[in-house]
Design a protein with these regions (language model features):
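Membrane-cytosol interface at the C-terminal ends of specific transmembrane alpha-helices
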Residues: 100, 113, 168-211, 215-218, ...
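Cytoplasmic-entry segments and transmembrane alpha-helices of multi-pass inner-membrane transporters
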Residues: 106-145
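Transmembrane alpha-helices
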Residues: 132, 136, 193-194, 216-251
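Interhelical loop and adjacent transmembrane-helix boundary motif
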Residues: 250-295
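Short membrane-interfacial helix/loop motifs at transmembrane-helix boundaries
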Residues: 43, 49-82, 257-264
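Membrane-interfacial helix termini and adjacent extracytoplasmic/periplasmic loops
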Residues: 62-86, 142-184, 254
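Transmembrane alpha-helical segments of polytopic membrane transport and secretion proteins
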Residues: 1-38
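Transmembrane alpha-helix signature in integral membrane proteins
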Residues: 85-113, 296
Length: 296
């Protein structure tokens, strides 16, 4: 059957026809469902925030915000415990920043290659491979870093510091290894989101640029990428979130020791500190670990 608006309907199929009362009832029910879903999301965020505040606030009151944030010594189980997280916070900031510096250019150029340069057959192979990277568990990246990157970093460390008796060798588990692994892990996110943004740029903009005499490379960097800027920024933000929130892969390659975040030092990130100590901590120690969540 076809109604006056041209929409086909069956005896038991969907139809836009119906009484005003039934339509109003359906609208009301759907509005309630949407509202409940939205409230649930807000409640979840609020519950997490309240839990962190209640659990970590006692440590902030006992230790002090200034002492915790600017003290560099983390020895929660010592006879005179110290709960300084300055090096841990600094490591997370520096590690994430360098991972973004390494990963974003590679990811963006890869997205440009798939979207603008590669032949359709090549893109049909590369794009699924990138999407497959996004589905690989974090622990796999960590194991690959432990088996491949750490030994290479150790060889580099030996070559640089072989005549330095004061250097504490890390076996390759250092900040550089962690940054490389993080940079690799954010690639799928940056590539996929950037690719989607580039594909959303109207073809007419590219054609107009080429018609004015611009080369393909000039069109890519002067027209296409600027037009997709908002989506690329979103890709970077998501990459930052992925990098700063990663734990399991980094705990395998970073050495997980609280040190100044220098390239060849074993370091600890906020997330790896939480993973490492939450299981056995108690009392003020546990509360201080929960305070690391505030920084995140």
């Amino acid at each position: 059957k076809t109604n006056v608006t041209g929409i086909k309907t069956g005896n038991s199929g969907f139809s836009i026809n119906g009484s005003k009362g039934s339509k109003a009832l359906i609208e009301t029910i759907m509005e309630i469902i949407f509202f409940v879903c939205a409230i649930f999301a807000v409640i979840a965020v609020a519950a997490i925030t309240i839990y962190m505040i209640i659990s970590g606030a006692p440590a902030l009151m006992k230790v002090g915000i200034v002492d915790m944030l600017f003290n560099t010594v983390w020895q929660p189980t010592a006879a005179e415990p110290s709960f300084g997280i300055a090096y841990i916070v600094l490591t997370s900031i520096i590690g994430t920043a360098f991972a973004i510096v390494l990963g974003v250019p590679v990811g963006l150029l890869t997205a440009v290659f798939i979207s603008e340069v590669a032949h359709k057959k090549v893109a049909a192979v590369v794009k699924p491979a990138v999407e497959l990277l996004a589905g690989i568990p974090s622990i796999v990246y960590g194991l690959l870093g432990l088996l491949i990157i750490n030994p290479l970093m150790y060889k580099l460390e030996l070559a640089i510091f072989k005549d330095n008796p004061n250097h504490q060798f890390t076996g390759g588990a250092n900040l550089i290894s962690a940054v490389i692994v993080l940079a690799i892990m954010i690639l799928p996110t940056v590539i996929n989101v950037s690719y989607t943004s580039l594909q959303a740029v109207p073809v007419k903009m590219r054609q107009a640029s080429l018609a004015l005499g611009a080369t393909e490379v000039q069109t890519i960097f002067k027209v296409t990428i600027p037009a997709a800027k908002s989506g690329i920024i979103t890709a970077i933000v998501l990459g930052v979130g992925r990098a700063i929130g990663e734990a399991m892969a980094i705990v395998l390659v970073s050495g997980n020791a609280v040190n100044m975040p220098l390239p060849f030092n074993s370091v600890r990130f906020l997330t790896t500190g939480i993973v490492s100590e939450m299981s056995y901590s108690s009392g003020l120690h546990r509360q201080s670990v929960l305070c690391c969540l505030y920084s995140l």
